[in-house]
Amino acid sequence: MSEQLLKNVRVFREMVKRAGENPLNFREIVEKCGEMTDSDILLVSKKGKALQVYRDPARQSGLAPEWEQGVTLDEEKAAVLGGYVKTATNADLRICGVGSEENAGNNLLLSLETEKGRLGTLILCRSDRSYAEDELILAEMAALLLTKELALAIYEEDIREKKNNEIVRAAISTLSFSELAAIIHIFNELDGEEGLLIASKIADRVGITRSVIVNALRKFESAGVIESRSLGMKGTYIRILNPALRDELAKYKRGFQ
């Protein structure tokens, strides 16, 4: 093992040590890997979304110019990228929609996987030279760290989604039949995640009293599912706070159509 490789391995080790039980930062891992290997780096999710992008400031980028954090591949190209199940060297990144026309160059593609399946792909590329064995070791270490962090992020997101669903279900369970009907009609008319509604018009249309709508909104607001505010003659401002609300309400819509 070369002295430089050992030094870089210790950098990764120190990052893990410093993080302790807290999640590591995707950006820090990707940037360190890019600096250590003089590479452009792209971290892509399973669905083809760029989670992190690093461009080596010292050389012309091998990544297509449109690649920035949040950019997403189309399904066909994401499937091509997902077809690399083992570490690949010098793949044609243009086929995957990743590489630039001028500098497809030298590259490494590393699949980020757990026993539950693929989580994403780590891509390193540069135009001036091929990757040495020491650099491949560093890329594999970065991939290992990123796989761990992606798995943790996905797990935490699943926990948040389950909690949000439970909160919405609990809020719905407090509604009477007429209040549930009112809520469903309200959110059928709400355009997007927030907007203004006139409760009296909805009450007349549905055939319920305005107080039923007020009570239903109050229960949802108490549960932290929505924010509502009366604006007098203009109507009532409503904003959805819980992202699970619409999906849960959709399960009840058929009975009120």
Range-by-range predicted roles:
Residues 2-29, 120, 126-175:
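Juxtadomain coupling helices with adjacent low-complexity linkers
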Residues 2-10, 19-103:
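Structured interaction and signal-relay segments at domain junctions
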Residues 38, 107, 235:
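Short coil/loop residues immediately preceding or within conserved phosphate-binding loops
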Residues 83-149, 153:
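Sensory/regulatory domains in signal-transduction proteins
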Residues 124-129, 188, 241-243:
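Short strand-loop junctions, especially beta-strand C-caps/beta-turns
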Residues 243-257:
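Short, amphipathic alpha-helical interaction segments positioned at domain boundaries
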